[in-house]
From Swiss-Prot:
One of its GO terms (molecular function) is ATP binding. It is found in: Cytoplasm. Transmembrane segments: none annotated. Homodimer. Disulfide bonds: none annotated. The keyword Transmembrane helix does not apply. Its main location: cytoplasm. It is an enzyme of class 6 (ligase). It catalyses: tRNA(His) + L-histidine + ATP = L-histidyl-tRNA(His) + AMP + diphosphate + H(+). Belongs to the class-II aminoacyl-tRNA synthetase family. The lineage of its organism: Bacteria, Pseudomonadati, Elusimicrobiota, Elusimicrobia, Elusimicrobiales. GO terms for cellular component: cytoplasm. This is Histidine--tRNA ligase.
Amino acid sequence: MTKLVRGFRDIFAPESNNFAELEACARRVFTLAGGTEVRIPTLELKELFIKSTGDTTDIVQKEMYAFEDAGGRVLAMRPEGTPGTVRAYIENNFAQTAPVQKLFYIGNMFRAERPQAGRYREFEQIGMEYIGNPSPAADAEIILMIKDIVTSFGVKNYGVKINSLGCQECRPAYKQELINYLKKDFDTLCEKCKDRLEKNPLRVLDCKIDGARFKENAPKQKLCAACENHFNEVKTFLQGRIDYIIDPSLVRGLDYYTRTVFEFQAGDSAQNAIAGGGRYDSLVKSMGGADMPAVGFAMGVERTIAARGETKDNKQNKIFVVSLDKNCNAKAFEIMSLLRSAGVICDGGLFDKNLKAQMKQADRTKSSFALLLGADEFEKGVVTMRDLSSGEQQEIKFNDILNKVGKIRL
């Protein structure tokens, strides 16, 4: 028997209802903010992620599903949504035709990580890339969108951290200071961090092995005046709208971030990040596009669902149509189609089964009411509607079904 690939899973109701609910919350928030949806390919050229995500990141070095196709192209299944969205922005010439874009995506990503509780090799992300707006207001707007999504979804216990990584003007001096600090303990660094030290020392502070022991005493970022003003304005826009703490050690795990970075965490652990992102003013240009500022975020759907801590059944009144006689099948099918056309959730159609089997299926599907149609009912022009919770039942004329059922459908 063919089995599921390790690290992947099937998702059924009621758990799948949570995915649909969170997606709906996000779409509502994005739409109210003027966002438009982009659907990017699952496959991209591997080079795209090397240029954007960064060749020193774990994602590129170890976690991408990459392969050579029959045409000799090296492709990769997307490990994150930002590079593909930015590529789409560049390739479709938005910089010239409509430079300011709020592009959101909802889709599955793929990383060859070690499977563990709550973490899979295929996972869903919700994200937005706000391209073309250099204002600190855009940073704050993105952060508040995340807040609106998680609160409307029902996540109660979460915290928010923010920081500024500076820009190309002020970051080099800080990076050198950080390198000098970390070199004192070079021999104790993990192999990954030894490699990162010269290329991107900020990533050492994000390391799961070494990060914690260096964060507290690491030198603090010294922002230039422009970055200081930008960060202060972000905080002004957030004031009174969301609680947050400033964490100088927050660096995020990708190479392209500049200035503002942020992270939403469920509970107290940094390993429980449910969403994060930041500004990346150089990414569009580095990928071959115009010199275009941008800020964005990604939210882990599975992690956000886990943070809420409950699985909703989303129970709705459902009608199950039962036919007791083959001569009634056509009428039963007509009733089933009529109810669906009127927006009533309606199941049935097991007309080759006996009454017991059909009623058992009605119970399995958690139907609220059954409409029974047999020879006697057909002769009288009625159906019997049975409340499957109380057992109470009543006869309803064919021409009154919509009126009666419509009153109890939700």
